[in-house]
């Protein structure tokens, strides 16, 4: 059987920063584009957080959180160890071992579920961060954008949509001579 291991550290901050630490490694090889272990990690985090929120009835009705909401304010490092890792491409920037994804997801969910349920106060704060991120995402996606009624080439300058910051109306009134 193939030996698999995963170690991770995660830290949630009160707000998100531009350069959040998120690093992934396989057998100490940096995987800049993540891959199976990162996807499994996110999946496990999401499952554990959904379960925690469901047990405590924290999640507002109709709001759905996703993995990106859970890690929005988090910094993390994931280190996986595999006997025969499969990488996508020769540069080893992305792990492509499907079996390892399920392993990491299960391990992450189990560990985080136990931690959240033994540290409920901190767990609720983390859940609030995820809920806040989900609400921000939902609000941004529901922002009404102007529907394009005309499909085709872009309009010339005179006919293009006006800039709401500098908009005006120009009226031309006819004169006596019909002009």
Regions found by a protein language model. Give the residues of each.
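GHKL-family ATPase ATP-binding module
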Residues: 1-171
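Single conserved hydrophobic/aromatic residue that forms the stacking wall/gate
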Residues: 170-179
């Amino acid at each position: 059987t193939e030996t698999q291991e995963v170690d991770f550290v995660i830290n949630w901050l009160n707000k998100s920063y531009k350069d959040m630490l998120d690093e992934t490694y396989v057998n100490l090889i940096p995987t800049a584009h993540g891959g199976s272990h990162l996807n499994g990690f996110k999946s496990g985090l999401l499952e554990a957080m959904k379960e925690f929120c469901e047990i405590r009835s924290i999640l507002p009705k109709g709001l759905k959180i996703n993995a990106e909401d859970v890690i929005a304010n988090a910094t993390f490092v994931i280190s996986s160890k595999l006997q025969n890792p499969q990488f996508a491409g020769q540069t080893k920037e992305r792990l492509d071992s499907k079996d390892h994804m399920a392993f990491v997801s299960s391990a992450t969910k189990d560990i985080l579920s136990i931690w959240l349920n033994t540290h409920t106060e901190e767990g609720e704060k983390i859940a609030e961060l995820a809920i806040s991120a989900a609400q921000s995402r939902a609000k941004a996606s529901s922002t009404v954008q102007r529907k394009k009624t005309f499909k085709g080439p872009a309009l010339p300058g005179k006919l293009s949509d006006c800039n709401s910051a500098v908009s005006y109306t120009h009226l031309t009134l006819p004169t006596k001579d019909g002009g």
